[in-house]
Amino acid sequence: MKEVELQNSIVTYLEYTGMLFTCTLGGVFLGKSNWKQKRMLSKHYSKGVPDILIFEPSNNDKYDGLMVELKVGYNKPTKEQKEWIAKLNARNYKAIVCKSLEQFIEIINAYKNETI
């Protein structure tokens, strides 16, 4: 499975739940010579921001939102992604890496119940 396919599955699930969320531009960049990428980066887009940002507090307000970095197969978070995850976790958000739709659903349930 490709990361974009995983993201599409998760977006479909999130739309069904009615949660407030958005996806970042992580996968749109095509190379260093791409003029669109250079223009976006000149507008202060940050490398490493998680793929899915969910703007829903956990049930007892332990967390203000859930930020999910998607990885498939043997892929691992980059240095910048790890830094963003650490910064978000230090600021009352829950940021986590996810590798499958099944894992995502488990994460959502644990997030809502504040068991993660």
Sequence positions of predicted segments:
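Catalytic phosphate/metal-binding cores of nucleic-acid and nucleotide-processing enzymes, i.e., regions
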Residues: M1-I116
